Amino acid sequence: MGIDVPLFRQMTPMGHRLSSTRPNYMTSIRLKSTIPHVGRVDLTNSKTMVHVSGRDAAKLLNGLFTLPVSSGAATPFSGVFGAFLNGKGRVITDAFLYTTSNHTEEDQSFVIEFDKAVEDELLLHLKRHRIRAKVKMEKLTDYECIFIWNRDATPDYWRRENECDSGFFQSLCEVAWSVAEVGETSEVEEKNGEPAQKPLYGLLVDDRYPLLGIRMILPAKTSTTYFSAIPSANLTQYNMLRYIRGTPEGSREIPPNKALPMESDLDYMNGLDFNRGCYVGQELTIRTHHTGVVRKRIVPFQLYQEGQEPGEYECQYDPELSGALPPLLDGSNVISLNSQPEERTFASSPFDSPKKEAEPKSEEAASEGGVPSWAKPKETDAAESNLPNKPKPVKLGNILSHHGNVGMALVRLDKIMQQQDIQLAVELPPGPNGEVNYLRAKLYYPLFVTDVSEAEAEAEAELEMERVRKEETHKNGQL
């Protein structure tokens, strides 16, 4: 594919009051203990792989994918992350698009890797737009999708070139792509009248976050043969790696036909190109980019106990707290506690650490009514609840996915920016007496966001734009 997306492009979100002195590419000590430094995970059971081939394959995909697709010759890293949108600009699914090892300009060959939960919908979307294009589409059932990471890698290992630099990934990439080269140039072994499978079918750098990892498509059950030296990992460890990196993925975190591309951080993860030609869903996306305000974003979060110190720069996994949490928190509300009567001193932003811990409460008081000590019930005094000026907690978003006390949430950043000394929490299931419980929460910048000062300036500009818009609306209403 003829696309050149800079791997280390600086990305700036709608900002918040965050210290600009924080380190980059820092990983939590507690989370390190659960995620191996080097790992290999098989994603085949959660993914669908569709092979799109034929003379018009690039033309078809170029009109549907959020990044440009070229019919040019394949290179070792000629694959990209992007999305397919519907006509209203909503995300059908995020996806990885590989140029396969046997791709040529005359016989184009691509593989789409995406969430298995939206398989039928995306296949219908592709067939609806195929019309008379010379394209063949089929599911790959005898291949596996492998993700490999090395958290000790440096940028020198990951330059987006036709070959890897020296270091850990040099041997990995050389083995992977040289195997594909041998498969193409050696004598074809006939087996039951069909050519033997090439050991490597697709390879790309997962550049949603710098140094995140590489993805490849191999014939089934061959990854252990070629990459046996890399420790095997599980899907939970892969998801936790994504949580700390702030990279949403799949239908749980990017709901089909509901999520908007920039609310889903596709622009931060190199998944959008605002300078390319037309594709389905482009109009709303481009208009939002140039004239609109992105009020929601998906961000990592950490739940922590009353009086506990959360991670300063990124979420920390707490096994003890995670074991005590209800099993299903997906969909739970993220709320502001600023309306609570208890005295609390917190940082000026949900992205900063608390300046002062809340006063500790006795175990007896905290566990009264069967409520665990880490889940403090909201006080609902009848006299106070009838006060006319007493505001209620404001819903700011909801949890999309989580593992224990860490995960991803979709939140209203515009409301968070408007509140000073904001205190955030996540609502838990009601207690035995019907009381509403909550657990403290902290939100984090995705770690690929490096220019905090520019992000803050962008946020202030968006708030000013919203203020001017309201004034104009008010004036027009008086005329």
Curated annotation (Swiss-Prot):
Highest taxon above the source species: Eukaryota
Q: List the taxonomic lineage.
A: Eukaryota, Fungi, Dikarya, Ascomycota, Saccharomycotina
Its Gene Ontology molecular function terms?
transferase activity
Primary subcellular site in the record, as a coarse category: mitochondrion
Asked if the Swiss-Prot or TrEMBL record annotates the protein with the keyword Oxidoreductase, the reply is no
Q: Which family does it belong to?
A: Belongs to the GcvT family. CAF17/IBA57 subfamily.
A GO CC annotation recorded here is: mitochondrial matrix
- Where does this protein reside within or beyond the cell? Mitochondrion matrix
Which residues does the Swiss-Prot or TrEMBL entry list as transit peptide?
A: 1-99
Query: Species name for this entry?
Result: Yarrowia lipolytica (strain CLIB 122 / E 150)
Name under which the protein is recorded: Iron-sulfur cluster assembly factor IBA57 homolog, mitochondrial
